[in-house]
Amino acid sequence: MSSTSQKRKKIQKKFKNRGYNLKFDALDEILVFADQFPDDDDGEAIDLLLDNLQETHKSSTVDAESVRGLINRLLGAHNAPEEPTTSASSLAIIDAFLVPKFGYDSVKKKFNEHTSSLPIHGEASAKTALYRERFMLLSQRVSRAEHFSRPAFDAEMSQFENNEISSIQSLISQRGRKWVMGVISQLEDGHFYLEDLSASVEIDLSKAKITTGFFTENTIILAEGEMQVNGIFQVITCGFPPLEDRDKTLKAHSEYDFFGGGTLTKEEMIKLADLERQAVNDTFVILSDIWLDDEEVMRKLETVLDGFESVETVPSLFVFMGNFCSRPCNLSFGSYSSLREQFGKLGRMIGNHPRLKENSRFLFIPGPEDAGPSTVLPRCALPKYLTEELRNIIPNAIFSSNPCRVKFYNQEIVFFRQDLLYRMRRSCLVTPSSEETNDPFKHLVYTITHQSHLCPLPLMVQPIIWNYDHALRLYPTPHTIVLGDKSEQEVCKFGGTTCFNPGSFSTDSTFVAYRPSTQEVELSAL
């Protein structure tokens, strides 16, 4: 009998003795969890899992979703330092490849979790599903908006009360002004098209009044207009689907763990919210573009570490976002052994600050030009070959994906390192509106929050792993979004969400000190 079969039987027996019936997919999740503790011959990890399950799980049937949430919390505790400033239960770090995937069923009007494994190299149908699921996600959100054209659109922009959305296919048989919703594209220069699940239609944006945001290919828009005799839909006003209040989204979908980290009871959420308010001393220090091969940058970084080593309460978390090299780590890059040594040097630098080493956690997120299998999103964590020496010196170091999610008590924070602002501006199909703001960063924040997606660029501009597009969703809208970008540092608060760019540490010596308890952002520089 194989060792895997023996493990399966052993796990099933333990759960049966405690009165639990394990579903097949839950057993697979537990096997993966157990494999992370190869020296655990006595099954203590499984016993710990069962002890925690008895405290939170009321049903005798155990499914994959319940197990996954519990395992994420336990692994967060396992990876935490012994005496951190922030307890393991307060801070969970969720890799993009572990984010639960949900698809919307428009017939049953509910979300279904995808529990089977997701291949990195998906079939062609996965690409089609990517667009369909993005559209369905926003469509069900809009369906809850009593007046979806407000406040996303100015009240004076439309004189009509009927805001019902028509399918594009039905435009052929209808007259008068209609609202449609679809994915915008440009199949040929100067010719724009709008497509929903029923059909596509050419649209004329020459007379359209648009709202704030970057209108790029792949973005989903709401448009009011009228069908012309030439078969072109003349757009009068258009904008993004209106943003939904986070609390309203949670009320509609309280049973789903969209963010990752496990679902919580109402009592647990109240308790965590209270603890979060009390955690006034917790600080996250966020730096982007830390070029380890640049001596001047390393001297500046040591100055930052020296400063925080001497404060009364050291930061609970340091977030180091790439790029970690001044040159792109592409096929022509031949200095990987040198880069490995530089990560080791960074580990020794952190180790020279004993209070930070013992009490802070260090999260590393790769940048768009860092070493990795490809530039496709989401990006996996930095290769272990590069970080091995640093890991040995700093046990509190965590290497995660890009994007990466962090849960601080109840607060949901998304980190994304991508030079998104420049690429979104360059990919615009129409000139952004200047009526509400001329600030490009505000246009960017408006776009990604209304699209509920971190990177709504065309796939030809920024490839995405089709089966993991859900890892870039911003649904429900998180409390905080950190957009690591080489552009100037900036902060923007919009729709209940705090969004900021820490700037480029290597170029401008800028970074951010973030206090999650109050969502206060301190833009800093040397």
Swiss-Prot record:
InterPro entries: DNA_pol_a/d/e_bsu, POLE2
Assigned keywords, A-Z: Cell cycle, DNA replication, DNA-binding, Nucleus
Highest rank taxon of the organism: Eukaryota
Any single biological process term in GO: DNA-templated DNA replication
Cell cycle as UniProt keyword: yes
Gene deletion effect: Embryonic lethality when homozygous, due to embryo development arrested at one-cell stage.
GO CC, any one term: epsilon DNA polymerase complex
Pfam families for the chain: DNA_pol_E_B
Compartment list: Nucleus
Gene Ontology MF term list: DNA binding; DNA polymerase binding
Induction context: Cell cycle regulated. Up-regulated at the G1/S phase transition and then decreases rapidly as cells progress into S-phase.
Main location: nucleus
Quaternary structure, from the entry: Subunit of the DNA polymerase II. Interacts with POL2A (via C-terminus).
Function: As accessory component of DNA polymerase II participates in chromosomal DNA replication. Required for the timing and determination of cell fate during plant embryogenesis and root pole development, by promoting cell cycle and cell type patterning. Necessary for proper shoot (SAM) and root apical meristem (RAM) functions. Is essential to promote the first divisions of the zygote.
Family: Belongs to the DNA polymerase epsilon subunit B family.
Protein's UniProt name: DNA polymerase epsilon subunit B
